[in-house]
Structure formats: structure tokens, C-alpha cells
Amino acid sequence: KLFIVESPAKSKTISKYLEGEYKVTSSVGHFRDIPKSSKDAIDIEAGFVPNYQIVPGKERVASELKSLCAKADEVILATDPDREGEAIAWHIAQICNLGNSKPQTLNSKQTGKSEIQNSKLKRIVFHEVTKPAILEALAHPRDIDDNLRKAQEARRVLDRLFGYDLSALIWKKVRYGLSAGRVQSPALRILMERERKIRAFRPKDYWVITAHTETKGKNPLVLACTEEPDKEAEAVRIVAEGKKGVWRVKDIEETNVRRAAPAPFTTSTLQQAASNRLGMAPAQTMRAAQGLYEAGHITYMRTDSTVLSATAQKEIASFVVGEYGTEYSTPRVHKTKSKSAQEAHEAVRPTHVGKKTVGGTPEQKRLYDLIWRRAIASQMADAAIARTKIIATTEAGGIPDFAAHGARTEFFGWLKADPDAKSDDVELPKVIKDEPLTLTDISSEKKQTEPPKRYTEAGLIKELEKRGIGRPSTYASIMKTLVDRAYVLRENRTLHPTELGDVVDTFLEENFADYISDSFTSEMEDDLDQIAEGKKDYVKLLKDFYGPFSKYVKEKTKTIGKLTNIGKAPANMRCPKCGSAMVIKLSRAGTFLSCERFPECDGARTMEGESFDTKKELKETGEKCPECGDSLPAGRQGKLVEREGKFGKFVGCSNYPKCKFIKKGAESEEAKRAADTGVVCPECKKGTLAERKGRFGVFYSCTNYPKCKFAIKAKPTGKLCPECSSLMMEGTKTIPERCSKKECLNHNPHKLLKK
């Protein structure tokens, strides 16, 4: 008997439960896919039939699966309980000739179930890797759900077609190597919408006025003016009137509010909470959650549902009563708000409530703690908060009211389980109406309005979900793609669009606004959901999209000119060689200023105004290019020359870009010695840290790369941090050294000064 899952870690956990009854193996994720670079990989005329190929490096996996399935009397396909898992199960059935992967018959079209052609094949699903869940699933096998599988295939084909056509156009019209995506491009547009608001923002002055008073019982009471004047004269008047006035308590407002228990985590809310509270990137969160799920510690982590099973509710209720008391227990059902809640999943929760700490890595332990606390809190009583507002003014009047706000937790409720979610109590002194107050100081402080804040990863996920763009299971990959493409920089969890991201988004908004709009992307997600439900036809959906889209791309290919200039340079930026005006151009390294008379004049400046030479003499190595050194006529034959690219120095062909040959390992020994700091790598203890250049500038990484991937962004000093014993690196002018570990207080000069 053969039991197939998609993860080696998951197969290891399940093997312990099945005690030798089954041979448990894995597909190691997706092992077949549609090629990224070949449009011929999809047969459009035949009804958008993809030509699947074995993923490079997975040939052995596919071969072993075929061999094992051929020998087995029974094959259990136990891949994940979602569209991706259904697709993997279908691919296994196809390559192993198990018969359950054949197209739908007329009888099976409504249900989406393929007819069983081979009785030894069974498909099972479970939402937690525990022995009871697996045994229950084995007792209730089903067919492969062709609707779910088709929904996954439709998404993949859509993304490929969108990317093939639009990315090819951007390569021709903007710059080679750029890309557009059906979901990544709308996400980039959202970031750029905010960025343009920030650029257009003009700050305005306002004044904050604060009065320090004492109550009758000599207790301090700090009050803030309820109005913030935008004229200094008005602020001066209020302060002057306040100084000579007699102060009293005008009114006291007390309200009792209830802070409702939060719902257990969905994929989206888990990613947001992990980002906000743990500082974890979405991809990091999903990796840690995957590990916890495969080890049997949490339920399936890709879900839109906030529902807990009846068994889980009872288990949590029993735990809450025993741990906190009966008054803290309030079992409840949190209704799922998402219209796309997929495939009857549960919320993300611990599989064993009694286990407070589990996980094989620090990230898994921190994430499990967050999941555990949220699941427990979701079944507890609301917290009761008493809020107080004291309003004060002068007896003579003539100035706005001043107010102080306080809050006190009367009953902790669910906050007992999740104290980090509690806001700090602000206790105000006891006063009565008309009680006199003694003014000890009153002052005004000039401030300026602030621009909208850039999106954090958590904020962008929330916005994508609100607009219906993508699905929670895709958010992590969206973030990763934007960063990998250098369209966005991630700094302290904040997402900063780059100049390159701006250029690509501007091009798409000017030419393909309808295809990267909220409505188009959201409606397409709804259509994919309808395929999964058997309500929409796969071929019709793709035909309705691709017919008009491909026609529009062809029209734009003819009408859009090559984007050589992306704007005019500031008037004060003149060509350093001939004095002509300059224009903004795009290079592999970003934007720069070029003489408007190019190619007659090759004067250039950085965006900051520093001039540079665009024609650096290339040093020949004395070798012919292995690819074109003999194949071209004399005078045009390629020679190997030393070049410098965005990732540092390399040896390549003199005929670049026509010939893209690059000699591997061609860095000179002299250059290697010059770049090596001699500081031993703290991670592998074998290599040393050497200077390298990446697309974001200079960094220092281990010479033992790729076996060791340790890297820091500044030159190491060789000393160890007094706070955490990590490696120290060069800092700023005011602080010569700082810790290389981001989580350490010693990493940030400002925090270090505060300490």
C-alpha cells in the first residue's frame, strides 16, 4: 500500500501514525508545471490545453513515483486539501497511469468528479496531520475533484498567458528582463498610488496646546486642547488666556465598552499579525506555518475560514475553564466574512490545545505561540473597558475645551490569554464636576501634518484582501515577486517602491489600466472560484479573457513607441559635456540623466547630479569568446573583456548584448584578495566575509557561498556585540559600530542612544 503526500516532512510525521501499514512517500511539492518562457507550452487552439513538463531537478521524483505506483496494490493520494493539492494529486495520477486523471465524462461534469478507472486509487483529505484525522480520512476516500483541479489549472494558464504577452511587450518597449503579472501588477499599482500621494503631499502647520494642572488633591492632570489651530497667533492667544484664567472641571464622561474576542486566524490575518507583532515577512510566516502543520502541531494554514470544529471548540472551552475559570469561557462561532472561503477548511488552530510551546525553530515557536493564544482567545469572554474623559476649561471661557482621556480594564476576558493585545491602561485622577484645577504650565508646540504612510507588508495584505485581489495563499508570493524584481524595497517591514517599479507601473497604467484594475482582477478571482464550484466553464473563461487581451497587446505593440526617455530632468541639471538639457533614462541599475542630444553627446549624470563617464575602456583578457570568437567575420569576432555589472566584476564577451557569454569563476585572485576582509564567517566558521556588489549596493557575504549564505550589509569589524554576541559591523559617522543582527537593540543607532 502506497500513501503519497507532497512534503517529506509531512511523510515522516505520518509514517509514525501508520506503523508500517503503508509506505509513505512524497512528491516534494509540484513536480510538473507549465514552462515559464515558452508560449507554445499552452495549446490555445485545442482549448487552452497546457503542455506540462517535469520541473527541472524533479525527474528522479517523477520516476520514483511511477515505479512505486506500479508496484502498489493501493495508492492513497493525500496531498493538501486545496486546489494546489488537488492538482498535485491529479498530476501523480496522470504520470502513473492511475486512470483517475482522465477528462470529465458527461456523467461527472456536474459534480466535478473524475470517474474511477483504476480501483486501486483513492483520494483522501485531512486538515490536520494527526492520527485521528488521518484514520478518519482513510475511512472516507473520494475521487479527485476535477473542478478544484481545473480552477488551479485555469489560474496557472491565466498567469502564464498574461505574463507571456505583457512581459514580452515590456521587454521590447521599456527594458529587457522586466515583467508584469496578473496579480503582482495590481499590487504594485496600489503601492504606487500611495507613493504618488506622498510625493504630492504638502505639509501644513498646526499647533498642539498642552495644559499641565493639579487637582484639589495635588494629583497631576495633563490636558490637551481639543482644537489644533493652524495659525500661530491663535495658539499664542489660547496660551495667554489660559495662563490668566481660573481652571475648573467642566464635565466628566464615563463609558463602558466591550472589546470583543477576535476570530481565530485565517491565512491573511495570520500573516498580518505575524508581521505586526513578530516582524515576520509573509513568506517567512508561511514557511514556519508549513513546518508546524507538517509536524502535526496546527491545522492547515491556507484557509479563508474562521470556523472551528465542534471538537476543537469543546477542547478549548474545557481548557479555558480549567486555566482561567468559568467566567472566562464563552464558546462562540465566528462567521467567515470572506466570500471566497475555500473548500470547507477550518481556521488555523493548534491541534492539541494542551501544548503551549512547540516548534523546531525559533520562528515556529513564536508563530505557534501567536496561533495558540488567538485560538484560545477566540472562545473566551469579551474584555470590559471603562473609559473616562475629563473636560476642563477656564471660568471666563473664550478658549476651546481641554480634555484628558483615560482607560481602565475592568474585566480582562480574552486578554488573559493574549495579554500582548492589551492596550496600556491610562489611569486618571478622581475628580468631580466644577472641581477647581491649578494650572502649573501651559504651552504650544508647532507641528506639521504628515503624509500618508507607506504600506507595511501587513497593510498591503489587508488592502489586497479588501479589494479582492489575489487570495491569501498567494499574498506571500506576491510580496516576494515585487521584491525579487526590484520593484519594491523592504525596509523595516515598510514597502518602498523603487524608480524601476515606478517606471513599470506608469507604463502599465498608461497602456493597460483596465487589465491591472481592481475590478478586473477581483472579478477574475471570483470567476476562478466559480470554476472550483463547477459553476463556470474553464475554456469559456480563458477564451473570454485571452481573445480580447491578445488582440489589445498586438495593437499596443504597433502603436507604443520605445520608451527611451521617461521624463525631463530638472532645468538646473545640464549636460556636463555640452551644456544641453537632460532627460531621465532607465538602465539596469535604475534611472539616470542623459544628454538630450544622445548619441551625438554621451554626457550623463546620476539622479543626484554627479557626472559620470558612460564609455569606460574595457580591458581585454587576451581570450576569444567561446561562443562567437570564431563564428563571426574578422573584425566582428568576440573577445573576452573585464566588465562591471550590478553584481560586481565579471568577464564577458565584447559583443554584448548580441552575445551574452559570461565566463564563470573569472574574478582575478588580486580582486578576490582585495575584497576579502579576513573576518571568519560566524555561521559556517569555514569561509571569510568578502565584499560583494548586489543590486542594492555593497554587502559582505561568506566566501563559502553557496554552501553558506550568511551576509551582512556593512563591513564587519571582527568584534562581537556586547548585547547578543553577534558580529559587529561598521556603523555611521556618529556611531562607529553596530550589531549585524537586526533584532538586536544594538543594531539601530537611535535605539542604542535611547538605551
Give the predicted meaning of each segment.
Residues 80-82, 175-179, 254-263, 273-278, ...:
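Conserved short loop/turn motifs at secondary-structure junctions
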